[in-house]
């Protein structure tokens, strides 16, 4: 079957998911699907909730093992009529992304499938009215602002509510499902636990950089399960349930749920910390297994999330996942009022809530306790023999000054919402963006021949919220990765130039459904997992916020991974998302060299000849 026909059939699967379905008679439903439908339609699905995730896993395994593409589509069409809407989209997306006969097929962007998860209720209500008043024409409405200056977090709405960042979080959890069974699926998810740690750690670092950009103090991590939480209102209404995502008033605390109680959360945290302090964990058979320096953080990632690969779920529990569920349900913990949960229940909405970042910094601090037990890097560990980084500059309109600004974009609503006509209904909104820039890295190679190296680029704030110079260890967990790539150095002097658009952290904007319909997919492989390109760097401020650009060069011969091909699929954003069906393409720990505690009190003590630290400024302007 031609790819265009396949693409059109996939598009039809997800269209108007917010509309009511007409159930099929049971005798017309494949027997493999008869046990599904336990989570009713109209409820909010959560991939953090064990029962929801269990049913979703059953469905994606059925679809994944279907004999051919036609059977996948037929099974999906049948299941759509009675399976929960959110669960359906999650499970079908996982199956399609991983089937060999779906290569080149693009799953429609989650923001077009469920625009109600990204667009405020007030804006959708306005769009509905405009479409009803003008049924014979295309409609465009501007997004309605839902916050105000009484809430300090409103300054960060451009970051927390960004369509691309929230879609990234949803897509990452589709690429890395917590229940992924490598033996059953026949595909590896290499270093999945470490990726869970690193991707979320980087989101927290980026959030703190945005706070500093807006003159705010760095976040205060969530610290105990009895503390009172800040309030939050998402101004989102689920069109599947007809109910708003729950509002959280100031001062509420977490409560026991029917599925889990707070005492278990305390126990799980203490058991994980005990494993870190003792240097070993207890596996399913009760054996003590050492947390080794190579795989320790990967093991901890699986324990904390927890994923299928957790070593002892009964003992170490599911600290991360149940934390999300508890945060989402604290305003109606026993479900007596039949309210929707809050946005923390869903991967496509949770980034909007400030507690997401505080809770993930709490999770990250557990990882940091483990990192503190690892040996520090020596100067030899941070030196690439024969390679000297002479100078690094950022080439923008003004050297070493990158300008950011707000840019208008649009989101189509009519694919996800049935407005009763064939006309387009769009929301116009603004997102952060930045001017194009390149890195110019001057390097001397005295090794005596051509040398393959890995270039690693990071950005970190220079000062804290009080204007104090950050020490290397303070800055370490605030550094954000910008790029990581292979380069070949000729003997002598070299200048390596790298365009920011080639970053291995980011992906371009998702392909609109309209374009998919017209072109039948995209040329080559588009994997969608990655941080949005327009959010690569923080906002900065009007004066020009001081950052430091770190570049370290390492020996590619020591970094290269056996079994990872140069032509691997889905490598456009390997730093956060890995490579499809292959080993993670870098032997170094994720975040190297900032994955270990830094001893030196000054950067002069930390830097080696193979590293560079350059002052750069990020300047925000109201005019593009």
Swiss-Prot record:
InterPro entries reported for this sequence: Di-copper_centre_dom_sf (IPR008922), Hemocyanin/hexamerin (IPR013788), Hemocyanin/hexamerin_mid_dom (IPR000896), Hemocyanin_C (IPR005203), Hemocyanin_C_sf (IPR037020), Hemocyanin_N (IPR005204), Hemocyanin_N_sf (IPR036697), Ig_E-set (IPR014756)
Residue positions binding Cu cation 1: 169, 173, 200
Disulfide bond sites: 529-577
Binding site for Cu cation 2: 320, 324, 360
Keywords per UniProt: Copper, Disulfide bond, Glycoprotein, Metal-binding, Oxygen transport, Secreted, Transport
GO CC term (a single one): extracellular region
Subcellular location: Secreted, Extracellular space
Additional note from the record: The two copper ions bound each have 3 nitrogen ligands (presumably contributed by His residues) and share a bridging ligand (possibly contributed by a Tyr residue) in addition to binding oxygen.
Family membership noted in the UniProt record: Belongs to the tyrosinase family. Hemocyanin subfamily.
Function (record text): Hemocyanins are copper-containing oxygen carriers occurring freely dissolved in the hemolymph of many mollusks and arthropods.
Subunit structure: Tarantula hemocyanin is a 24-chain polymer with seven different chains identified.
Protein name: Hemocyanin E chain
Organism per entry: Aphonopelma sp. (American tarantula)
Lineage: Eukaryota, Metazoa, Ecdysozoa, Arthropoda, Chelicerata
Gene name of the record: HCE
């Amino acid at each position: 079957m031609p790819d265009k026909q396949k693409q059109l059939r996939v598009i039809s699967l997800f269209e108007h998911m917010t509309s009511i379905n007409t159930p099929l008679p049971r005798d017309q439903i494949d027997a493999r699907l008869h046990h599904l439908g336990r989570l009713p339609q109209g409820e909010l699905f959560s991939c953090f909730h064990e029962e929801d995730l269990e049913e979703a896993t059953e469905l994606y395994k059925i679809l994944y093992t279907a004999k051919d593409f036609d059977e996948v589509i037929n099974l999906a069409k049948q299941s759509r009529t009675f399976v929960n809407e959110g669960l359906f989209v999650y499970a079908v997306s996982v199956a399609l992304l991983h089937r060999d006969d779906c290569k080149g097929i693009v799953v429609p962007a989650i923001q077009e499938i469920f625009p109600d998860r990204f667009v405020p209720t007030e804006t959708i209500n306005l769009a509905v009215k405009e479409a009803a008043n003008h049924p014979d024409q295309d409609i465009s409405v501007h997004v309605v602002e839902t916050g105000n200056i009484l809430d300090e977090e409103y300054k960060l709405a451009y970051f927390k509510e960004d369509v691309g960042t929230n879609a990234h979080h949803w897509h990452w959890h589709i690429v890395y499902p917590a229940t992924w069974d490598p033996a059953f699926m026949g595909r590896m998810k290499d270093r999945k636990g470490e990726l869970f740690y690193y991707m979320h750690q980087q989101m927290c670092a980026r959030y703190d950089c945005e706070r500093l950009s807006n003159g705010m103090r760095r976040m205060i991590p969530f610290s105990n399960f009895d503390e009172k939480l800040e309030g939050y209102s998402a101004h989102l209404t689920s069109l599947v349930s007809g109910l708003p995502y729950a509002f959280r008033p100031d001062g509420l605390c977490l409560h026991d749920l029917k599925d889990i109680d707070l005492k278990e959360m305390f126990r799980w945290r203490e058991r994980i910390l005990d494993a870190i302090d003792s240097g070993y964990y207890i596996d399913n058979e009760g054996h003590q297994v050492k947390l080794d320096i190579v795989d320790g953080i990967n093991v901890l990632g699986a324990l904390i999330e927890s994923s299928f690969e957790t070593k002892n779920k009964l003992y170490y529990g599911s600290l991360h996942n149940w934390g999300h569920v508890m945060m989402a349900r604290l305003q109606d913990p026993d479900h007596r009022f039949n309210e929707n949960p809050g946005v923390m229940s869903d991967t496509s909405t949770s980034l909007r809530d400030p507690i997401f970042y505080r809770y993930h910094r709490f999770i990250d601090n557990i990882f940091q306790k483990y990192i503190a037990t690892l040996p520090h890097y020596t100067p030899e560990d941070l030196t690439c023999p024969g390679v000297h980084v002479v100078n690094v500059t950022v080439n923008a309109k003004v050297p070493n000054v990158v300008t950011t600004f707000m840019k208008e974009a649009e989101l189509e609503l009519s694919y996800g919402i049935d407005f009763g006509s064939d006309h387009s209904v769009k929301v116009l909104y603004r997102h952060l963006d930045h001017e194009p820039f390149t890195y110019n890295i001057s390097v001397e190679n005295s090794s005596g021949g051509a040398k393959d190296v890995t270039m690693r680029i990071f950005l970190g704030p220079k000062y804290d919220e009080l204007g104090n110079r950050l020490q290397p260890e303070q800055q370490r967990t605030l550094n954000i990765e910008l790029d990581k790539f292979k380069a070949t150095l000729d003997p002598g002097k070299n200048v390596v130039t790298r365009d920011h658009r080639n970053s291995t952290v980011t992906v371009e904007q998702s392909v609109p459904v309209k374009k998919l319909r017209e072109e039948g997919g995209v040329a080559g492989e588009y994997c969608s997992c990655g941080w949005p390109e327009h959010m690569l760097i923080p906002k900065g401020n009007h004066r020009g916020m001081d950052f430091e650009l770190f570049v370290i060069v390492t020996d590619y011969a020591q970094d290269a991974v056996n079994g990872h091909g140069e032509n691997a699929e889905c490598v456009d954003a390997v730093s956060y998302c890995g490579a499809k069906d292959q080993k993670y393409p870098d032997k170094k720990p994720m975040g190297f060299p900032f994955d270990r505690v830094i001893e030196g009190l000054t950067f002069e003590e930390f830097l080696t000849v193979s590293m560079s630290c350059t002052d750069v400024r990020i300047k925000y302007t109201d005019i593009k």
